[in-house]
Amino acid sequence: MNKNKLNRLDEMMQSQVDSGMIPGGHLRIIKDGERVYDKCFGMADVARNLKVSDNTIYRLYSMTKPVTAVATMILYDRGLIDLSDNVSWFLEGFKDQKVETKDGIVPANREVKIIDLLTMTAGLMYPDRNVNPSGDKMADLFDKFYERAFSGNGTYSTVEMCNEMGKIPLFAQPGTCWNYSVCADVLGAIVEVVSKKRLGDFLKDEIFTPLGMNDTDFYVPAEKRDRFAEIYIRGEDGKLTPCDWQHLGLVYKYTKRPEFEIGGAGLVSTVNDYEKFAQMLLNGGKYGDTRILSRKAVDLISHNIITAEQAKTFNWDSCIGYGYGGLMRTLINPEITTVGSAGEYGWDGWTGNYFCNDPENNLTFMYFIQVCGGNGIRPLRTLKQVMYSALDD
């Protein structure tokens, strides 16, 4: 790649810091297995005067989802599950599923299946109030969860929480439309039931330890907290201040292992660790001499597997031109999105972290920050535009 063109990224990243868009961040680009751009900018924690570094620990939030997808496909590779399996076979809370409709609550047309969870087409909701009755009831469940957590009496376990989720009527019939929701959390519970291990233990045994992802977990041990980045939120005045609240079932501020290990949002990691995970996917399930997934399993989750009808609601600005695979977007119409190559896949997180793999060009792009809600799609798109301009003919 043209290193002179890549150097343009220095100015762009520093501008994000200087303008107050982010307190700090890390941008890494890997081409053909080599780090062709790898620089840190600004502060991981302003109050502690902690600079962003290679070993800064970040909250992944929804970049946890691809990890849970891989865990699910490990079970698939071993013949322990089939993607057409009913979720109720593993989680009894999903038996006799009901659906909220304009005419009231009715029985589901069919059972929720594992493939519905992988593709976010199960009809589930996140805890969103004033959207629909299902979202309100999911929010009630999470409120109850927080009450238990903050009372000091412990919370629901992963399996217990997901069984409670299954008792809430769906907002739509299973398999009919895409909707971002707790699907990955439920997959995490299925991993626990099938493997007979806690989700964190399964991930450590089957993914993190084999890949050498030693700083990835559902909490940050005391001896590593001096590397843990602060999380910031933008106020009405546009300025960033530390954020002291948590959502999506995250509690304890990562100081101890949670009872509910959240497959959709709970992990922390470093750029170094997540690079190994991303490269494993890009290499068809293998990193170095270590195989985590079959190439077939990687192909399945990294390609579009939702129908045109389901995709009508997959309409976020950041997903224009993309289809959806196993808890990841996948680029199917690059002429619409204007940046990227057909077959690119990846995902992002609530605090602005983002990764994508481009198999056509053997590229991995990683952008890590800690700002609630991220900083929009334009900064990411312009960074990627410069990356692609640096590709040699």
Model-derived features: where do they sit?
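Short, conserved catalytic-motif segment at the N-terminal edge
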Residues: 2-60, 80, 96-104, 377, ...
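Short glycine-rich, acidic/polar surface loops and turns
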Residues: 327, 342, 347-357
